[in-house]
Curated annotation (Swiss-Prot):
Transmembrane segments: none
Classification via Gene3D superfamilies: Peptidyl-tRNA hydrolase
Active site as annotated: H21 (proton acceptor)
Subcellular location field: Cytoplasm
Organism: Prochlorococcus marinus (strain MIT 9312)
Annotated GO biological process: protein quality control for misfolded or incompletely synthesized proteins; rescue of stalled ribosome
Chief location category: cytoplasm
UniProt keyword list: Cytoplasm, Hydrolase, RNA-binding, tRNA-binding
GO cellular component: cytoplasm
Record keyword ATP-binding present: no
Family label: Belongs to the PTH family.
Assembly: Monomer.
Protein's UniProt name: Peptidyl-tRNA hydrolase
Function comment: Hydrolyzes ribosome-free peptidyl-tRNAs (with 1 or more amino acids incorporated), which drop off the ribosome during protein synthesis, or as a result of ribosome stalling. Catalyzes the release of premature peptidyl moieties from peptidyl-tRNA molecules trapped in stalled 50S ribosomal subunits, and thus maintains levels of free tRNAs and 50S ribosomes.
């Protein structure tokens, strides 16, 4: 049976549970709930862990318990424990440089200033791993300085209006993840990258 490893990035704890920076957590929590699976803390994996079987695949879901800036420690622990290749993992992460509702699948790339991705790249010593980036939009600028308040934006709570958009994004990403073992890679990439919230 094919095994699929999904790693959602975020910060543990109630304080961050509904923040934009926790979209990776939120998406995998939605996926796990769909299959009536629950997350349990696995110290050896430095993550909360959930698994289920679907479409002739075993899905292994991980929510690092290391806080965002040390996500690489959890990813390294997962790779070491399961003895898997990098191409078997899919990292799900928020992206402030993408408009809200946009999705981008990339097989490699820089951190783009995202501390979670930066930590993974530093620990693994490579940029070559699958990542699904979900847009949260840019933070608003202040009139006084015209600078972006990035920290307060990414750590801020998702609004009701944003949630209505992100719920549709989650559906598209989850559908795509469910098809990883039944559709060609090009199909999955196009399904994610072509998503347009205006056409839903």
């Amino acid at each position: 049976m094919n095994e699929i490893y999904l790693i959602g990035l975020g910060n543990p704890g109630k304080k961050y549970s509904n923040s934009r920076h926790n979209i990776g957590f939120l998406l995998l929590e939605n996926l796990s709930k769909k299959y009536n699976s629950s997350f349990l803390l696995k110290d050896k994996l430095k993550s909360f862990y959930s698994e289920f079987k679907a479409n002739d695949s075993t899905y292994r879901l991980f929510l690092p318990n290391t806080f965002m800036n040390n996500s690489g420690e959890a990813v390294l622990a997962i790779l070491d424990w399961y003895k898997i290749n990098l191409n078997q993992i899919f990292v799900i992460v928020d992206d402030k440089d993408l408009p809200l509702g946009k999705i981008r699948f990339r097989k490699k790339g820089s951190s783009g200033g995202h501390n979670g991705l930066k930590s993974i790249i530093e620990k693994l010593q490579t940029h070559d791993f699958n990542r699904i980036r979900i847009g949260i939009g840019s933070p608003p600028s202040t009139k006084e300085t015209n600078n972006f308040n990035t920290i307060s934006h990414v750590l801020g709570n998702i609004s009701r209006e944003e949630k209505s958009i992100l719920d549709k994004v989650y559906v598209r990403v989850i559908e795509s993840l469910e098809q990883l073992n039944t559709k060609k890679e090009e199909y999955i990439i196009n399904k994610l990258n072509s998503f347009d919230i205006e056409q839903i």
